């Protein structure tokens, strides 16, 4: 079979195999201003880029105001974090400071408390790919809430509507 190209309604080409009617999957582009940041109310602003509801994976960009501390949580799956700006660390590991350009891998089962130093010059900007859920813990280590792909998408859509008048932001959603 040979590759041919046809036009999609958007005018962008999509590749097809000759003799088939099914198109190859195409890449989905989201520019930084396609999805709004929402104020989560605790010194964080979230931009949910992608969720795979079947696999339980959520991809987001988060900005943290100086002095922000996020509730202690345990991950049920692996997390990848890439710091774009600013600096942050886990209270449990104060010497391991994430700065612009740093990559962090968190294995499933890791427990920590994210903290952004109050003396940061501006917001800290981090890109996360999270597999599974965050089990949010109280001071005794008991689970008080769960954050996962489903809840992140639901809350993000709600906050987009409340804060920006956008009820259906163009989050890339798989596995729905």
Question: Language-model features: where?
Answer:
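A short, N-terminal "cap"/entry segment at the start of jelly-roll beta-barrel domains
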Residues: 1-56, 142-176
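Conserved short histidine dyad/triad with adjacent acidic residue
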Residues: 41-48, 56-74, 107-111
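"Short basic amphipathic alpha-helical interaction patches in structured regions
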Residues: 63, 75-77, 95-103, 142-144
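Ligand-binding loop in jelly-roll beta-barrel domains
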Residues: 95-100, 108-139
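A generic structural signal for short coil/turn motifs at secondary-structure boundaries
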Residues: 70-73, 91-92, 115
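Short acidic-glycine-tyrosine-enriched beta hairpin
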Residues: 53, 80, 89-111
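Conserved catalytic motifs of the protein kinase core domain
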Residues: 57, 79, 123
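Short, conserved beta-strand element in jelly-roll/cupin
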Residues: 63-65, 74-90, 129-131
């Amino acid at each position: 079979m040979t590759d041919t190209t046809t036009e999609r309604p958007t005018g962008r080409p999509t590749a097809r195999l000759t003799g088939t009617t099914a198109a190859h999957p195409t890449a989905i582009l989201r520019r930084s201003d396609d999805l709004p940041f929402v104020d989560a109310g605790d010194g964080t602003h979230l931009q949910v880029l992608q969720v795979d509801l079947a696999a339980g994976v959520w991809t987001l960009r988060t900005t943290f105001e100086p002095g922000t501390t996020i509730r202690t949580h345990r991950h049920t799956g692996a997390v990848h974090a890439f710091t774009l700006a600013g600096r942050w660390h886990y209270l449990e590991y104060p010497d391991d400071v994430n700065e612009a350009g740093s990559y962090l891998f968190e294995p499933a089962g890791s427990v920590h408390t994210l903290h952004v130093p109050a003396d940061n010059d501006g917001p800290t900007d981090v890109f996360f790919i999270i597999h599974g859920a965050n089990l949010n813990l109280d001071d005794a280590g008991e689970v008080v809430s769960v954050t996962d792909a489903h809840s992140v998408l639901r809350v993000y859509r709600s906050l987009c509507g409340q804060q920006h008048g956008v009820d259906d932001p163009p989050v890339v959603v798989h596995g729905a």
